[in-house]
């Protein structure tokens, strides 16, 4: 399935000047290389992995990060939803709605594949 998602992204980004897609081990990553900044965005978890302005890295992942399907990437800026941290330590207004055994830390959005709905570029 990952190869299929990669192919869909490649087709979506084929006419883009600054955007492309590459595989990092098992995960497709959208790569943005603009004259003013660069960034990497994982499709799994819609997670910002890297951001740099000119040659100054502002955000990055550990060199030991593992790009595995279904495994949350440590670092970057993840989407922590629908809860943050240990599900049991969230307030009752959140934890009362969690009805799964061993819920993942920071919710399930981090390990789900997201889809690119729309894309545009500007200079």
Annotated model-derived regions:
Residues 2-123:
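Surface-exposed acidic/polar loop and edge beta-strand patches at domain peripheries
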